[in-house]
Amino acid sequence: METLWDGILSHLKGRLSRPTFETWIKPATAQQFEQDCLIIRTPNPFARSWLQQHYAGAIAQAGEQVIGRPIQVDFIVSEQSEEALKPVIEREPAPAAPPANVASLNSKYTFSRFVVGANNRMAHVAALAVAEMPGCNYNPLFLCGGVGLGKTHLMQAIGHYRLDIDTRTKIAYVSTERFANELIEAIRRDAMQTFREHYRRVDLLMIDDIQFIEGKEYTQEEFFHTFNALYESGKQIVIASDRPPQLIPRLQERLSSRFSMGLITDIQQPDIETRMAILQKKAEYENMFVPQDVIHHIASAYTTNIRELEGALIRAVAYVSISGLPMTVETISPILSPPRTRGEITDEAILELVCDELKVSAEDMRSDSRRRDISQARQLCMYLLRKYTDLSLPKIGQALGGKDHTTVLYAIDKIEQSKIRDPEVQRLLQRLGNRLEADARH
C-alpha cells in the first residue's frame, strides 16, 4: 500500500501546482487498500469534501498508472480531527498568536457551501487562489456586486480556509462601519497605538462594505496607512463593495488607486440554474425535503438576492411543517411574499422614463449617436440602471445598444461628478428617482 501511495504522490506532484499539492494532497495518508479500493485518511471534514469533489478522479487515475489496473478511492476523516468538526469560531486559538476578530466569521460561509455558477465563477476562482496563496497574485482582491450575491460568503470562506490550514493565522474580518466606529473610540480613549497594532499585525484583513467609507476623511486616512502597512509586509487584503472603486463617491484618489492594484471581480445575479442549485444545497445541508417543482417555483420568483431566495425556502418549509400540509407549489405560493427588491423597477421602465423626461427616442438611446442631448440622456440612463437595478456593467451596456462596460463606467462616473457640481442635475435625478419608486409601488 505504501508503494502505491508513494507512486500516486509522485504522479500528482508533477501534475498539480505546488500550493495545491501541499495544501490538499500532502496532508492526506493512505489508510487501507483492499479489492482495488484505496481508503484515504484526511485531516478534517472540509479536506475530505474538497478531495472527493475535486481530486478523486486524479488520484484514481494516478493509482491506475502505478499498478496497471483501475482503482476506486474513498475518503475518511482522521479520528483525531474531532476538533475540526467544530465551527472555526469555537476553536481555541493558539496562545502564541491569537487570531483577530475570528469570532465574527460565520461557520456556514465556507467554500464547500458556496454554489458556483456563471455569475460568480471568476470571483470564486480568485478567492480560492487568494486562500491558497495569500499576498501573492491578487492583492488586494476587490469583490463587487449587488446586495445578497455572495461577496461576504466568499470573503469569510477565505478566512475559514486559512484557519483550516493554520489555526494560528491572525485574521481581521470587519465591516467598514465597525472599523470607523472602532477608530472613533480609539481616538476618544487615546488608544490609537492599540488600534493600529490590532489591524496592522494581522495576516489577512477582510473589510466589507467599503463603499460606506465615502466622505469619511479621517477613516480613509487611517485605512490608507493600514493598507500600506499590510501590503508592504506581504499580507493579504480582501475588500467587498456594492460598486467598483471608481464609482465610490468622495473616495480619495490614492485609495481608489490602491484598491485597483490587484484584481477587481464582479459578482452578478445568478441564473435560474444557479438559483436552483443554491436552494438544493441549502435543503441538503438543513435536511429539508423539497420537491424539484417547488425548488423551481421559488427560484423563479426570487431572482436578484440570494439571502431572500434562501429565506423564501426556509419560510416555505416552516409553513408546511407547522400546518401539516404537503409540500407543493399550490401550498407554498400564498405565503411567498413578493421579493423586497428593486426588481420591480425594470430596465425598460427606466429607459421609457428617461426618454419621456428628456424627449429622446429609445432608438436614439441605443444608437451610436454622439449628439449632446442623446449622449447626456444615455449617460443618465446608465446611471439610473446601475442605481435601481442589479444589472452588471456589461448588461447595462447591452441594454443600451451594446455599449462597452468601460463606456458605462465613464457615464456613471460623469453623472456622479455632475450631481455634485450641478444642483440642476441633482434635482433631475431626485425627480426621476421619485417617479420610478412611485410607479413601482403601483
From Swiss-Prot:
- Write down the SUPFAM superfamilies for this protein, in alphabetical order: P-loop containing nucleoside triphosphate hydrolases, TrpR-like
Where is the stretch described as Domain IV, binds dsDNA?
321-442
Check the record and name the InterPro entries matching this protein: AAA+_ATPase, Chromosome_initiator_DnaA, Chromosome_initiator_DnaA-like, Chromosome_initiator_DnaA_CS, DnaA_C, DnaA_dom, DnaA_N_dom, DnaA_N_sf
Where does this protein reside within or beyond the cell? Answer: Cytoplasm
- Segment Domain II: which positions? 69-103
Q: Where is this region: Domain I, interacts with DnaA modulators?
A: 1-69
Residues annotated to bind ATP: G148, G150, K151, T152
Q: Which GO terms describe its cellular component?
A: cytoplasm; plasma membrane
Give the keywords, sorted.
ATP-binding, Cytoplasm, DNA replication, DNA-binding, Lipid-binding, Nucleotide-binding
User: Does the keyword field hold Transmembrane?
Assistant: no
What Gene3D superfamilies does the entry give?
A: 1.10.1750.10, 1.10.8.60, 3.30.300.180, P-loop containing nucleotide triphosphate hydrolases
Q: Which GO terms describe its molecular function?
A: ATP binding; ATP hydrolysis activity; DNA replication origin binding; lipid binding
**Where are the residues of the annotated region Domain III, AAA+ region?**
104-320
Its main subcellular localisation, reduced to a broad class, is: cytoplasm
Give the domain of life. Answer: Bacteria
UniProt GO BP: DNA replication; DNA replication initiation; regulation of DNA replication
The keyword Nucleotide-binding is annotated on this UniProt entry = yes
Family according to the record: Belongs to the DnaA family.
**Role played:** Plays an essential role in the initiation and regulation of chromosomal replication. ATP-DnaA binds to the origin of replication (oriC) to initiate formation of the DNA replication initiation complex once per cell cycle. Binds the DnaA box (a 9 base pair repeat at the origin) and separates the double-stranded (ds)DNA. Forms a right-handed helical filament on oriC DNA; dsDNA binds to the exterior of the filament while single-stranded (ss)DNA is stabiized in the filament's interior.
Domain notes per entry: Domain I is involved in oligomerization and binding regulators, domain II is flexibile and of varying length in different bacteria, domain III forms the AAA+ region, while domain IV binds dsDNA.
Q: How does it assemble?
A: Oligomerizes as a right-handed, spiral filament on DNA at oriC.
**What is the protein name given in its UniProt record?**
Chromosomal replication initiator protein DnaA
State the organism named in the record. Gloeobacter violaceus (strain ATCC 29082 / PCC 7421)
